[in-house]
Every structure is written in structure tokens, then in C-alpha cells.
Amino acid sequence: MKQGLHPEYHHDAVVKCACGNTFTTGSTNAELKVDVCSKCHPFYTGKQKILDTGGRIEKFMKKYNLNQK
């Protein structure tokens, strides 16, 4: 096998989020900067917004005079 082919692996790579959260993981980069992490992502924080598309369907039905059966 060729020597020096693979990049150096860092077992204690630091991940820094835009929200200020930091944690360590393994990576070929010594430091990673991310925009979203599990501490600030809406899915994990419970601040997820649910979009209601029912109003759009009703508007379409009314516009084209379609009756639901």
C-alpha cells in the first residue's frame, strides 16, 4: 500500500456551531464550523412550525366552483 495516501484523522476535532455550542467528534479536519446543530435545530428543540395547506385547497375549490363529494 502507498504511504501518505490518506489524510490525517483527528479523534478530537472540535465542532463549533453558530449558536455557540461546541462538541468534539472524529474528522479529517481539526476544526469544523456549522450553521445548525442539535441544540438549535427546530426539530430537536421542539420549536418546529407546521404549515397548514388546507386553506390553499379550499381556496382552489372555491375558485373553480368544485364541490367535494
Swiss-Prot record:
What keywords tag this UniProt record? Metal-binding, Ribonucleoprotein, Ribosomal protein, RNA-binding, rRNA-binding, Zinc
Q: Where does Zn(2+) bind?
A: C17, C19, C37, C40
How and how many cofactors are bound, per the record note?
Binds 1 zinc ion per subunit.
Q: What does this protein need as cofactor?
A: Zn(2+)
State the superkingdom: Bacteria
Give GO MF terms, alphabetically: metal ion binding; rRNA binding; structural constituent of ribosome
Disulphide bridges, residue numbers: none
> Pfam families, from UniProt?
Ribosomal_L31
Keyword Metal-binding set for record:
yes
Signal peptide (UniProt feature, chain positions): none
Coiled coil spans? none
Q: Name one GO biological process term.
A: translation
Q: What InterPro entries does the annotation carry?
A: Ribosomal_bL28/bL31-like_sf, Ribosomal_bL31, Ribosomal_bL31_A, Ribosomal_bL31_sf
Q: Which SUPFAM superfamilies match?
A: L28p-like
An example Gene Ontology CC term for this record? ribonucleoprotein complex
Q: Which family does it belong to?
A: Belongs to the bacterial ribosomal protein bL31 family. Type A subfamily.
Which PANTHER family is this protein grouped with?
50S RIBOSOMAL PROTEIN L31, CHLOROPLASTIC, LARGE RIBOSOMAL SUBUNIT PROTEIN BL31C
Write out the function statement from the record.
Binds the 23S rRNA.
Listed under subunit, the entry gives: Part of the 50S ribosomal subunit.
What HAMAP family would the database entry show? Ribosomal_bL31_1
Could you tell me what this protein is called? Large ribosomal subunit protein bL31
Q: Which organism is it from?
A: Clostridium novyi (strain NT)
- Which gene is this protein's source? rpmE
